[in-house]
Amino acid sequence: MKKRNIKLFDPKIDFNEKRNIKLVFDSHNWASGSGSNFVNSFEKKFVKYTGARSGIAVNSGTAALHLAVSNISKVKGEVIVPSLSFVSTAHCVLYSGHKVIFSDVDPLTGCIDPVDIEKKISKKTKAIIPVHFGGLVCDLKKISNIAKSHNIPVIEDASHAAGATYHKKRIGSHSDFVCFSFHPVKNLAMPSGGFITINSKNSEYLTNTIKSKRWCGISNRIGTDYDVKELGWNYYMNEFSAAIGVAQLSKLNKLNKSRQNNARKYFKGLNLDSKMPYTNSCSYHFYWILVNNRNKIRNKLKNKGIETGTHYKPIHKTSYYSQKYKIPSTEMMSDKIITLPTHPNLSNLDLEYIIDEINKII
């Protein structure tokens, strides 16, 4: 019998992505905003999709976070982030000269805990960065209320949450800044890409400022003349990524619906108490379970042809960020978590197989 090979992540593509790539390739204009103008098109479509006031396409989720944090207080201070995240969530704070303050998560959701935010916040706090872990949306109402009471912005890390909703509004339309990541493993797949949506009252000013920073700080371009008024970076999205993104965005709701159906099957079928909750507002970038003897279980699943993950090693446990923090729920989750595939290429037989194998092992 042929051994199964079930991937943890796998983008779903069709002729639309191939057609768009060919259009860009044949145009010979592959840089942002040139040739077939897929970057401009993607920007407009994604802003409309999220319901945001404005938005800017960039070349990674890390770039999106960096640009967002670069526009908070120029007075150096502290930014509160969860440690249970990819390192970019913390890196972006240091890039802008601020100090990272790690907050714990709610062990029932994996999302940042508003109660712990209240404990960590101070007069030095300049922003809060909640992460929608696995696509499960944080308690934005509580976080927003905390931020407003301290007159600081919320910068959502929505790297896992393209297409997710909160109170029936899409993620991207709620906070001051919302940062997305697009990658072959993400819900909206691209070779590489990112996006910032902006919902502040001064969104027009911030959009223009970030667009300047996205291209090395260049502004006031007239013909071949331009000015540079502040530091910037080369964070443009390229036309190839945007071409794929336009095709992916047109079917994102359908792709996420498939992920939700897969997550529902895990939630109903797995004989575990500690598992990711089910809600139709989640985009389910992955599905997580918490187990003892994680490595042994992962190895058994690997031998059965099932790829799994461990999202994430806590940032405060890495050498660079090594700090004596007491973050018990984060450390418990990171020690026990196994992430399972939810991607739309999974068949019903694949899901049944994964569920059966896990139930046999546990």
Language model: regions and residue ranges:
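PLP-dependent aminotransferase class I/II
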Residues: P11, N40-K44, Y49-G55, T62, ...
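Active-site phosphate-binding strand-loop segment of PLP-dependent enzymes
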Residues: L108-M190, F195-S203
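Helix C-cap/helix->beta junction micro-motif
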Residues: S96, S149-H150, K304
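Phosphate-binding glycine-rich loop
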Residues: S32-E78, L84, C92-S96, F102-D104, ...
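Short, well-ordered alpha-helices that flank and scaffold nucleotide-derived cofactor binding pockets
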Residues: H66, S70, K74, K119, ...
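N-terminal "arm"/small-domain region of PLP-dependent enzymes with the aminotransferase-like
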Residues: M1-A31, P341
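Hydrophobic/aromatic ligand-binding patch that stacks against planar heteroaromatic rings
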Residues: H91-V93, I146, F240
